[in-house]
Regions:
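Nucleotide/phosphate-binding site architecture used for ATP/NTP-dependent chemistry
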Residues: 2-125
Length: 125
């Protein structure tokens, strides 16, 4: 018996609408958001994060994104059509314009800290 995910894995994704249906947040759902983060993802000020694995954030979109290049090998491995690069919503999404996200995509992205501190001890090496 095949499942929805099996059929999606075999099919080449042709447009952004199909691409959005492949969204899988199982990894993110296994993590804890910073309890001090905002509910709407408008959390752009630099600050220390003391708890949680990530901060939900709405990316800052590039005003007029332009397609430059992609890896044909990676697209083939991910079963993405190269025509997807011509889809304006695909380009806008990967340029930070999350307003084009279709369900089941999340209405915000996420950011993680780049410094490591465990129980108050900073690790720099």
């Amino acid at each position: 018996m095949s499942t929805k995910s099996d059929s999606l894995k075999k099919k080449v994704t042709e447009n952004f609408s199909e691409f959005s249906q492949l969204s899988d947040y199982s990894f993110l759902n296994s993590l804890k958001a910073d309890p001090q983060s905002t509910k709407d993802g408008n959390d752009h000020k630099p600050r220390s994060v003391y708890s949680g694995h990530y901060v939900p954030v709405v990316p800052t979109a590039i005003p007029e994104p332009e397609y430059i290049s992609h890896s044909n090998k990676l697209f083939k491995e991910l079963r993405l059509s190269s025509d997807l690069t011509k889809d304006q919503n695909f380009c806008r999404f990967f340029s930070g314009d999350i307003s084009v996200a279709d369900y089941p995509m999340s209405p915000f992205g996420w950011a993680t800290g780049y410094a490591l501190s465990i129980y108050g001890t900073e690790y720099t090496q």
